[in-house]
């Protein structure tokens, strides 16, 4: 017959166990919160560092990455030497005072002058040794290359507007003729020349016509094709 004996120590430990487990859970939870806080702080610091590094690039890796002044570009100098060397090879095929030799010498001088002017103008060259233009107006202003963008842009707009305005004035002028269609097919050169000279100041003239209300055609005069 087996006898079962009660162990007081076991009973006492069983009474203490629930509070110990609660203390252990509290300690684990505190440790988890502390770890999460450290991880969050580390992630925030990493995000801040990444944002700063992206928003403030170094001068060596500017927004015009890969472009260097042509005067400092090795590829640009190499390209100049290559072109001159090609011309020199062709020059050796002709006599010194022959017409082709004189023409090639003039071409060599123009080539040297062209490369020198590009370098002096401060143009930027890529890895291919060719000058590149900055098409972004903001970057062009930032790096002092605004003329490379704005001058061609305004030049194009002026020429395009000039052609359109003078052509419009010509059509208006021949509209009152007996056969206006013939004037459109066979251009009236004296009239066209006169209007071409008058159209040089077309931006101011267009603004004045807009203020008078004569620049745009009335809606009732605009035909609509059937659909």
Swiss-Prot record:
Keywords: Chloroplast, Photosynthesis, Photosystem I, Plastid, Thylakoid, Transit peptide. It is found in: Plastid, Chloroplast thylakoid lumen. Residues 1-62 form a transit peptide. GO terms for biological process: photosynthesis. One of its GO terms (cellular component) is photosystem I reaction center. The keyword Thylakoid applies. Its main location: plastid. InterPro entries: PSI_PsaF, PSI_PsaF_sf. Belongs to the PsaF family. Probably participates in efficiency of electron transfer from plastocyanin to P700 (or cytochrome c553 in algae and cyanobacteria). This plastocyanin-docking protein contributes to the specific association of plastocyanin to PSI. This is Photosystem I reaction center subunit III, chloroplastic. It comes from Chlamydomonas reinhardtii (Chlamydomonas smithii). The gene is PSAF.
């Amino acid at each position: 017959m087996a006898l079962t004996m009660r162990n007081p120590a076991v009973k006492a430990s069983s009474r203490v166990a629930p509070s110990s487990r609660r203390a252990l859970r509290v300690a684990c939870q505190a440790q988890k919160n502390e770890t999460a806080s450290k991880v969050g702080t580390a992630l925030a610091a990493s995000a801040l560092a990444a944002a700063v590094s992206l928003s403030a690039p170094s001068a060596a890796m500017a927004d015009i990455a890969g472009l260097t002044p042509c005067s400092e570009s090795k590829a640009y100098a190499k390209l100049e030497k290559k072109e001159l060397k090609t011309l020199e090879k062709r020059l050796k095929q002709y006599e010194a005072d022959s017409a082709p030799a004189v023409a090639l010498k003039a071409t060599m001088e123009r080539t040297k002058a062209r490369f020198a002017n590009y370098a002096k103008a401060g143009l930027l060259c890529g890895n291919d040794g060719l000058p590149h233009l900055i098409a972004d107006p903001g970057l062009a202003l930032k790096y002092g290359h605004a003329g490379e963008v704005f001058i061609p842009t305004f030049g194009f707009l002026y020429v395009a507007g000039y052609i359109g305005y003078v052509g419009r004035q010509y059509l208006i002028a021949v509209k009152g003729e007996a056969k206006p269609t013939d004037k459109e097919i066979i251009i009236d050169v004296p009239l066209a020349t006169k209007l071409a000279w008058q159209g040089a100041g077309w931006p101011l003239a267009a603004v004045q016509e807009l203020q008078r209300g004569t620049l745009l055609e009335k809606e009732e005069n605009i035909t609509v094709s059937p659909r």
